[in-house]
Design a protein with these regions (language model features):
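Alpha/beta enzyme core
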Residues: 3-87, 91-207, 213-231, 236-242
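Non-transmembrane, interaction-prone segments in cytosolic or luminal domains
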Residues: 71, 88, 247, 256-257
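Flexible, glycine/charged-enriched surface loops at secondary-structure junctions
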Residues: 185, 254-257
């Protein structure tokens, strides 16, 4: 008899970690080694980041990775760690909600991040269509933990006030459609974070931790329920590796001196 937790149990565990004021912190990963490092450090869940996975696989972010390859990467990561895994699936890679739910379940992931940018045009998708997609995904997999990202702050029209209003409308629509958490990427300073948290009346909000932005501890004080890091840890590691390679190219040792 298997002692492994069921997919339903893993999903419930992930969902329960989204607590406003006591956020789930997710250093985003891109392969099995980075996923194991996060799990070994004691983090209770692992999240992939498409902008880190894509270059690790040799592709551009923005759905440049073939769906089969992205899903295969997610499956490898889910097998590598004992904690719940949530996968960044961009806007679904052209799959309908039922197909996405089925293929995600096959990887072992119990959560997903879905954004509302139409990568064919680079413009925000219609909010109603995105909400309908999320509702279909929820119907196809009641267990799946859905983190619904809105790109209003980074791709929306108008000034800061108009973008905040659009983000608020989208977040509320996505929660009503069945999302568990909303992710207004680009809400970086305290004023914006406070505004998006207030806009959804205490429902879980994911915020991107960014250089120069509020610390994870401060984001917790602002009522955030989930903190992610996008591609930034992968980028820092790549910059470090590039420096090591440059040292070797100069004829120097890449190793720290005693």
């Amino acid at each position: 008899m298997s002692t492994e937790p069921s997919r339903t149990a893993l999903a419930a565990r992930l969902r329960a970690l989204h607590v406003p004021g006591d956020p789930l912190v997710l250093p985003n990963v891109w392969d099995c080694a980075s996923a194991r490092a996060v799990a070994d450090a004691g983090f209770p869940a692992v999240a992939t980041g498409s902008a880190a996975v894509a270059p690790a696989l040799g592709y551009e972010d923005g759905e440049g990775t073939p769906a089969d390859e992205m899903l295969a990467a997610v499956a490898r990561i889910a097998r590598a760690v004992p904690v719940p895994v949530t996968a960044d699936m961009e806007r679904g890679y052209g799959m309908g909600p039922a197909e996405l739910a089925e293929r995600l379940a096959a990887t072992g992931a119990v959560g997903c991040n879905l954004e509302d940018t139409d990568h064919r045009t680079g413009a925000p998708a219609d909010a109603g269509e995105q909400a309908e997609y999320l509702a279909g995904l929820r119907a196809a997999d009641p267990d799946l933990v859905i983190n619904a990202r809105t790109d209003s702050f980074v791709r929306g029209a108008g000034g800061p006030a108009e973008r905040l209003a659009d983000a608020a409308d989208r977040m509320r629509a996505y929660l009503e459609a069945g999302a568990d958490c909303v992710y207004p990427i680009g809400a970086l300073d305290e004023t914006a974070v406070r505004a998006v948290v207030e806009a959804v009346d205490g429902r879980p909000v994911n915020v991107l931790s960014w250089p120069g932005g509020p610390s994870p501890a401060r984001l917790a004080e602002l009522g955030v329920a989930r903190i992610s890091f996008g591609h930034q840890l992968h980028q820092l590691l790549q910059e470090y590796f590039t420096g090591l390679v440059a040292a070797v190219a100069r004829g120097d040792s890449p190793f720290p001196k005693d």
